[in-house]
Amino acid sequence: MIKQRTLKNEIRATGVGLHTGQKVYLTLRPAPIDAGIVFRRVDLSPAVDIPAHAENVGDTTLSTTLVNGDVRVSTVEHLMSAMAGLGIDNAIVEVSADEVPIMDGSAGPFVFLIQSAGIQEQNAPKKFIRIKKKVVVKDGEKEAAFYPFNGFKVSFGIDFDHPVFKGRKLDATIDFSSTSFVKEISRARTFGFMHEIEYLRSKGLVKGGSLDNAVVVDKYRIMNEDGLRYDDEFVKHKVLDAIGDLYLLGTSLIGEYRAYKSGHGLNNQVLRELMKREDAWELVTFDEEETAPISYIKPLLAV
């Protein structure tokens, strides 16, 4: 059967919070079968747990924020994307502040941490949500939708009226049966416009943002000396974000996600709509790995 997965060992890292600019200590720990991904604020006494579920999303301004009462953990999407890409079902994520460290602005450092900790299969079937019917949410010209598909595929389109985006590939369709999340998606960094960053800083936000953890665009060009990691890094980062946001279903997906100009807010809205539409999905497990439409990197490779 396709089994649930957790980490083999705990692992620690330190980074800065994107919004506070303060140092954040991060610890990833193994968790038991069916625990899911749980964020834990260890700077509070007693510590407060927030399960990584769509209904616990309390804010989607600039990042995806999970809440439990008045306790928050923001910028969870890049770490969630790494968990999804490596098929981790169960883990405790301890943070010493109200946001996950931004690292280099991609999921790459989190992939490295998880692979360094090692991946442990658990003796229980991995659960998947299989899309049975189309579910669409629109907001003006923005759109996000689920479609039935025997595998996992993400199609994303972006549109910016800006010189840097002219002549660049602004859409991507990634079929994960033939594309490696680790190689093709995980290293795509978040991006922002200089004028927006200056405005946000004036409001006390993105204090930790820099050319070390984002692709920054001014009026005419990319400001990062080393340029882009992929020609289509902008849209690939949107795919990365979407994978992290979708993993707040609490299980892996069998289906296609199509989005146009969607962000964290619409990603979350369509998840909530899907959950309400109980005729549009079913929970499935696989006794035989060979019959499954999705496969994951073998744990032995990730030690």
From Swiss-Prot:
GO molecular-function term, one example from the UniProt record: UDP-3-O-acyl-N-acetylglucosamine deacetylase activity
UniProt keyword Membrane present: no
Top enzyme category: hydrolase
Binding site for Zn(2+): 78, 237, 241
Gene Ontology BP terms: lipid A biosynthetic process
EC number: 3.5.1.108
Catalyzed reactions per annotation: a UDP-3-O-[(3R)-3-hydroxyacyl]-N-acetyl-alpha-D-glucosamine + H2O = a UDP-3-O-[(3R)-3-hydroxyacyl]-alpha-D-glucosamine + acetate
Keyword annotations from UniProtKB, A to Z: Hydrolase, Lipid A biosynthesis, Lipid biosynthesis, Lipid metabolism, Metal-binding, Zinc
Keyword Lipid biosynthesis: yes
The protein's required cofactors: Zn(2+)
Active site (record annotation): 264
Source organism superkingdom: Bacteria
GO cellular component: membrane
HAMAP family documented for this protein: LpxC
Family to which this protein belongs: Belongs to the LpxC family.
Protein name in UniProt: UDP-3-O-acyl-N-acetylglucosamine deacetylase
Lineage: Bacteria, Pseudomonadati, Pseudomonadota, Gammaproteobacteria, Cellvibrionales
